[in-house]
Amino acid sequence: MSFLELTEVWGKPQKDIFFPSGSEVEESTDAPIQRTVQPIVTGSSVLALKFADGVMIAADNLASYGSLARFYDVERLTKVGDNTIVGAGGDISDYQQIQRLLEKLEIKEGNYGDGYALQPSYIHEYLSKVLYARRNKLDPYWNQLIVAGVDGENKEPYVAFADLRGTTYSAPAIATGFAMHLALPMLRKATDDDRWKTLSKESARATIDECMRVLFYRDARSLNKFSVATITPEGIEFQTDQSVSSKWAFAEKQYGYGTQTV
């Protein structure tokens, strides 16, 4: 076999090896259309918790291209209406499409002019139906979403989750991505057994900061630059370009770090 024959497939899509260009399988239009079967540019953790006066939600600004930390200024929290924030982990392009859907929903609701405003529970139900419908088409939006806000006439704190399969639930503390393993125990420690009802805004922020610090230390898909949104009956306070202090002296004692003599 010549060198040219060996290198013929270099640089070609893998499907050409099994289904040569022009084959019956490749040109078939009966197969389902799938776009985001394997996400390329992704965001990792989003975390949210209730406190006495409202809800706090945070997400870092990193979008990773595979395992490469590629984009450092991606906002993964979106304001919807007057008292709702939607945070997204997973595929960034799918998240951008969800943002467009939410913008259309806001415009449509505003056109009614009936005095009613979008509530967090309405938005969560809408997103859960959208995600479940796309899952049934075998072309899901590859995201995990957290909807946070103050809901209803009494402005009750509201935090709920929805993912690409249409799975939904609500809890005092929720996280996505690697934060489900690293940060959620700390969030639950602050909120379980109705402790969130006496949790101050300052304590909630301290918990969020500690979670973001742990994620920065331990999650390779995280960044020490994040946004925090606080939703209370008075409105939304959106803080960007936040960071936490970090100390790496402990790394010298970790096996495999730097030049060590074993």
Swiss-Prot record:
Any keyword Membrane? Answer: no
Q: Which GO terms describe its biological process?
A: proteasome-mediated ubiquitin-dependent protein catabolic process
Q: Which SUPFAM superfamilies match?
A: N-terminal nucleophile aminohydrolases (Ntn hydrolases)
InterPro entries listed in its UniProt record: Ntn_hydrolases_N, Proteasome_beta4, Proteasome_bsu_CS, Proteasome_sua/b, Proteasome_suB-type
GO CC terms for this protein?
Answer: cytosol; nucleus; proteasome core complex, beta-subunit complex
Q: Identify the domain of life.
A: Eukaryota
Q: What does this protein do?
A: Non-catalytic component of the proteasome, a multicatalytic proteinase complex which is characterized by its ability to cleave peptides with Arg, Phe, Tyr, Leu, and Glu adjacent to the leaving group at neutral or slightly basic pH. The proteasome has an ATP-dependent proteolytic activity.
Summary of subunit composition and partner proteins: The 26S proteasome consists of a 20S proteasome core and two 19S regulatory subunits. The 20S proteasome core is composed of 28 subunits that are arranged in four stacked rings, resulting in a barrel-shaped structure. The two end rings are each formed by seven alpha subunits, and the two central rings are each formed by seven beta subunits. The catalytic chamber with the active sites is on the inside of the barrel.
Name of the featured protein: Probable proteasome subunit beta type-7
Q: Which organism is it from?
A: Schizosaccharomyces pombe (strain 972 / ATCC 24843)
